[in-house]
Amino acid sequence: MRKGTKALFAVMAVSALVGAAPAVDPPARPGVDAPELARLGAYPVGVADLELVQPDQADPLKGLGAPAMADRHLPLKIWYPAARAGPGTRYRTALSGETGIDVPFAVAGIATPGVAQARGRFPIVILAHGYGNTPELLCWLGENLASKGYVVVAPAFRDPPISDRSAAAFAGPLARRPLDIAFVAAEVQRRARAGQGPFAIADAERTALVGYSMGGYGVLTAAGAPLDPWVGGATRGVLAPYAAGGAKADLLKVANLKAVVAIAPAVRLQDKPIWAGSGVAAITAPTLFIVGSQDHVVGYDPGVRTAFDAEVHAPRYLLTFKEAGHSIALVGAPAEMRRTFWDIDWLEDAVWRKDRLLPLQAHFVTAFLDRYVKGDAGKAGFLDGLVPDSDTGTWPGLPRGRFAGFSPGAPTATVWKGFQPGKATGMMFEHKPAS
């Protein structure tokens, strides 16, 4: 190769490096325009992997005349408060492409694998992902909560490819979500009491459930909403004994439950109600619903708003992102997931930026869990008495210019407490007490 050509390639290589996109910040780390409680807590974050095995479980995806029986393997991603900071990590995961072939990609994380745990006893959060998702897509919330003193346990449910729209494929996630959530919660609590492994610092008496989409269906069911008997038939009989009136119905309910967060939860399937009788009215644990007003996957009204109205025996809250769709809880799309419409539609919203959506949710989830799981009454001002429409808030005496301080909330201002000027916009937040 001639010297001139070599020099040209050298210049091109340097230019490519200089012009390369900067590293993406971990989604758990909020931007400077995030509300007050979105910021990371006092603890560094560690992450561990563990597999739980539940023997002799019915698998509706296998077997001819009846579901096959096999051991159920559940890999867990566990985020926890750490004793010291570390370099962080990169989570490697994948989502099903349009052809059913997985598209691999990586997500930056603030957690460090294997770092020593902090001392203390921390509440348990079971974090349940959506249909076809993975725990890594919710790492922003797992890491953020761990930095604030929670042990977050996220099972990988290993659903069939979402491109398979058959009833047979859907039976698996429909059956296993509530069963897996109940099993994981009970086993984590058992190991916490025994001081075992990564759960030695977990407090078995304080548990919260957080679920997105199909995971939202799972956590609401595990919180006490009784399954309609038709779900038994839709799962090849797997859920029949767990449906309302069934011999095992009580086994789905998680013990020591202090709070539930349901993000864009599936509340109707095949245009039928999932739950029997009073449905979510059977839930008594405080519940935070989060949804986009244009969520055409699970529905808004009828849909998630309907469930919020119906859960009359629990104090509940509804955070609505105006014009947002269904993907509100998932990390933003990396370069690998921006090559086709199918791929980017997994992760990105038509209206909202992800670096806004995720910190906004972290703010409200933090306030909610701190109040109802940790008993921090000081967080009530971030939840109660807010003007329902964020766009109508006022702040008399606000300093002129680009003031970056946080609203003090009522009675000084009706701009939502913890928000910067002009940043509480495009949302609704509603509260209804238990009756």
PLM features per residue range, with description:
Residues P26-A28, V32, A314, E323-H326, ...:
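Alpha/beta-hydrolase-fold serine-hydrolase catalytic core, especially in secreted/extracellular enzymes
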Residues I274-A276, G299-D309:
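Short alpha-helix in the alpha/beta-hydrolase fold that links the catalytic acid
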Residues I283, F289-V291:
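Short beta-strand/loop motif that positions the catalytic acidic residue
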Residues N144, A171-E205, L220-T221, V231, ...:
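Alpha/beta-hydrolase active-site loop
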Residues V24-V125, S147:
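Domain-level recognition of soluble alpha/beta enzyme cores
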